[in-house]
Amino acid sequence: WNPNSNSTKRPSLDLYYQRSLPHKQTLILNMVGTYIHTNANQMYQEWKNDILLSDILSNVDGDKYSIIGEGIYERQFEAGRLGGGLKHTQSWTDNTYSGTVGGRTKMKQSETYLYTEFSGRVKKLNYTAGIGVSRSWFKQEGEEDYQYYTFRPKVSLQYNFTDNMYFRVNGSVNNVSPSLSELSAIEQYIDTLQIRRGNPYLKPYKSYDMQANYLYKKGIFTGDLNFYYSNSPDRIMEEVIRENNKFIRITDNQKGWQKLSGDLTLRVGPIIKRIISLSVTGGVNRYISEGNSYSHTYNNWYYRASVMAMYKKFMAMFQIQSSYNTFVGE
């Protein structure tokens, strides 16, 4: 018997300001403040012949405050567009755990991202190049704090062979910080055999992402070919270890995770008096999950097909698709 109850309150305030300045300049300011109150309850009991064998109660009552502020500056030149910005995120969390196991955690986390980029065009080539630096900081009450700096370049190139054919490639390096819930140094009983344990020693990791896209159109026919690759060394993923005849589910910086994905979309339309459009997509995802104590691979083939009809002010659509599965960790 395992009833669960969860409630969340999430009020937020979003302030946005944009101003056009002389000499083709633009200034954008954005600030978001959010408060999240969460109450989660889980009760797990095991009975045999009307005899209570185990009774596990877990309650989490938490408050999280966050402020996200960002400033963006852009200026248009004859050769292209120059932009830059600063984004800062600050979070405070206070969680109280009660039931079979009790405790309290107070955590602070911040991330600052400073970046600049330039976009331009040379004949048939559109390009964007940017660089950025991010700083991640975390402090849990009773533990040492940490901070990490990450260099984050990105590039985007698109070559237009004709008005109906182009090739585009994007590449970027992103910083991923652990969530406050993953960093919590608290154990929670799931049932009589499983325990979920936080890890205050998690470190941010980098994600190297690349995407390529080729599109060709001729008349009513369109072909769209996509390829995606992501590589995350030291990615934070779950693993299961055994201690004192219990299975401990923890997250840790594992060896790495990779995803390779490719798909082809064929579209025809509009046909039959310019009313009907058809689209078919087929693709595959391959996942490689390398843990400190495990190694797994998984392939997911998927498809998607749709028919759309448009007549005057009316539109109807039918779509069917298979599961688009993901695989991370164990």
Task: Give the residues covered by each predicted segment.
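Outer-membrane beta-barrel translocator domains and adjoining extracellular loop/strand segments
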Residues: 1-2, 39-50, 94-103, 139-148, ...
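Face-selective signature of the C-terminal outer-membrane beta-barrel domain
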Residues: 2-143, 160, 221-227, 258-286, ...
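A conserved cytosolic signaling coiled-coil/coupling helix that links sensory/transmembrane modules
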Residues: 117, 162, 166-169, 174, ...
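Active/binding-pocket-proximal capping segment
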Residues: 132-134, 172-176, 186-188, 230, ...
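Outer-membrane beta-barrel signature, preferentially recognizing the C-terminal barrel domain
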Residues: 175-224, 231, 249-261, 269-271
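Gram-negative outer-membrane beta-barrel transporters
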Residues: 229-231, 253-325
